[in-house]
Amino acid sequence: MIQVQTRLKVADNTGAKEVMCIRVLKASTATLGDVIIVVVKEALPNMMVKKSQIFRAVVVRTKQAVRRANGMHIRFDENAVVLIDQENNPKGTRVFGPIARELREANFMKIVSLAPEVI
C-alpha cells in the first residue's frame, strides 16, 4: 500500500533514483498497477529528470502483499514505480527488476514489454 509521503525507488533509466508520492489517484492508497503523482527527491546529474520535478508514475512493486484471484499472495522487497507520461507510456527506455502481472491487466503493455521478468 502506497500513501501520501511514501518514498519509492524508481525502476527505470530516467535518472531519478528516489521519488515521494504526493497524490494517489482514484483511491486513498495505491497498490500494484495504480497511478500516483510523485516528486523527484533524488536524481542523477545530467539526466532527463531533475530534483523537485513532478511526474505521474505507476506502482510496479510493493512490500505489502497483494492477493491474487487464485489465492496466491505476491510481495516484493521494495516499493518501486516507473515514471509515465499523460498517455501512460514510460518516460524511460529500460525497466529494471521484476514487474507484477497486475500491470498487464491494468493495460500498461509497454512497461510489461520492457520488463526483464513478469511475475
From Swiss-Prot:
Keywords from the UniProt entry: Chloroplast, Plastid, Ribonucleoprotein, Ribosomal protein, RNA-binding, rRNA-binding
Function comment: Binds to 23S rRNA.
Assembly behavior: Part of the 50S ribosomal subunit.
Protein name per the record: Large ribosomal subunit protein uL14c
Record PANTHER family: 50S/60S RIBOSOMAL PROTEIN L14/L23 (PTHR11761), LARGE RIBOSOMAL SUBUNIT PROTEIN UL14M (PTHR11761:SF3)
Organism: Cyanidioschyzon merolae (strain NIES-3377 / 10D)
Domain of life, source organism: Eukaryota
SMART domains per UniProt: Ribosomal_L14
Family named by the database record: Belongs to the universal ribosomal protein uL14 family.
GO cellular component, one term: chloroplast
Record has Ribosomal protein as a keyword: yes
Listed NCBIfam families: rplN_bact
Subcellular location: Plastid, Chloroplast
InterPro entries: Ribosomal_uL14, Ribosomal_uL14_bac-type, Ribosomal_uL14_CS, Ribosomal_uL14_sf
Primary residence: plastid
Listed GO biological process terms: translation
GO MF entry, a single one: large ribosomal subunit rRNA binding
One Pfam entry name: Ribosomal_L14
